């Protein structure tokens, strides 16, 4: 009996060692995975909204290693009975991908796999409109003039993504939280409407391998210019893990939208991986918004 238990214990130890060796060789940083496995999460603008918005888009990722990925995306934002708390969800519906290295070995190189779902709650903890109201009441303009808007966001990542064997998605849950400060400057003219500057810092955590988890801090800077029929934003950011296995991705993103009547906004976007995110992303999409808090 004791001998049998010892043999089973040895088998368990051997299995754990093999598991740890496999995952250490596999790597758990974004650099070795598909573009949507552990993506750099878009910064929040610093202001929640009273609009229900639905966004559909399609992304093409060109890897620095000549890999190709096509991904349709969905995004949804819902005010929770007030504009100060929003529920947001986004989903990489399906990755269609191929690697150029496989071209000589396979007749059909394209594969597809479902992606992960992200859900977050965004809470407005400070807003410049509140400050404007307080200015009128107190007339203490000097001390209140430069107080920014602020949003606290907490979210989760599901483990719904597949094709772990080909390193498309990590097949593990995660969560994140961040805090964004934003200042908005308005102009009184027919063409230029506003300029918003935001910065954020946060925490990102995901499960890796047999037992460990990777903890990373998130960071970002964002600028958004809005005109009558144009919206241009640029964002630099990323996150930094502690395992030094390609887990410190950084990128710069830019997006050009054209707000139209009836709440529609077509847009084009581009993302370039600066470090540990080895892709160019080209995106085209359409956003629809409607005010449901009146």
List PLM regions with ranges.
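Hydrophobic, aromatic-enriched interface-forming segments
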Residues: 168-211
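Cleavable N-terminal export/targeting peptides
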Residues: 1-41, 293-294
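Hydrophilic extracytoplasmic domains
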Residues: 261-294
């Amino acid at each position: 009996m004791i001998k049998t238990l010892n043999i089973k214990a040895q088998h368990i130890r051997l299995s754990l060692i093999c598991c740890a060796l496999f995952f250490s060789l596999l790597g758990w940083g974004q650099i070795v995975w598909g573009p949507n496995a552990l993506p750099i999460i878009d910064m929040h603008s610093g202001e929640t909204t009273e609009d229900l918005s639905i966004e559909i888009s399609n992304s093409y990722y060109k890897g620095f290693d000549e890999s190709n990925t096509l991904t349709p995306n969905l995004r949804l934002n819902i005010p929770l009975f007030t504009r100060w708390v929003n529920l947001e969800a986004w989903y990489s519906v399906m990755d269609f991908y191929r690697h150029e290295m496989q071209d000589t070995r396979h007749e059909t190189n394209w594969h597809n796999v479902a992606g992960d779902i992200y859900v977050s709650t965004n809470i407005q903890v400070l807003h410049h409109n509140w400050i404007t109201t307080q200015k009128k009441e107190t007339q203490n303009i000097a001390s209140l003039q430069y107080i920014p808007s602020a949003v606290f966001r907490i979210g989760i990542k599901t483990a719904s993504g597949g094709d772990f064997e080909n390193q498309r998605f990590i097949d593990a849950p995660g969560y994140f939280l961040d805090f964004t400060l934003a200042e908005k400057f308005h102009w009184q003219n027919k063409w230029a409407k506003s300029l918003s500057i935001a910065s954020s810092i946060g925490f990102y955590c995901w499960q890796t391998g047999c037992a460990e988890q990777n903890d990373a801090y998130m960071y970002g800077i964002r600028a958004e210019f809005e005109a009558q029929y144009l919206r241009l934003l640029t964002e630099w950011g990323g996150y930094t893990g502690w395992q030094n296995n390609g887990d410190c991705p950084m990128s710069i993103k830019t997006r050009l939208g054209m707000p139209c009547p009836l709440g529609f906004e077509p847009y084009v976007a581009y993302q370039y991986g600066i470090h540990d995110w080895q892709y160019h992303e080209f995106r085209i999409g359409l956003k629809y918004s409607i005010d449901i808090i009146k």
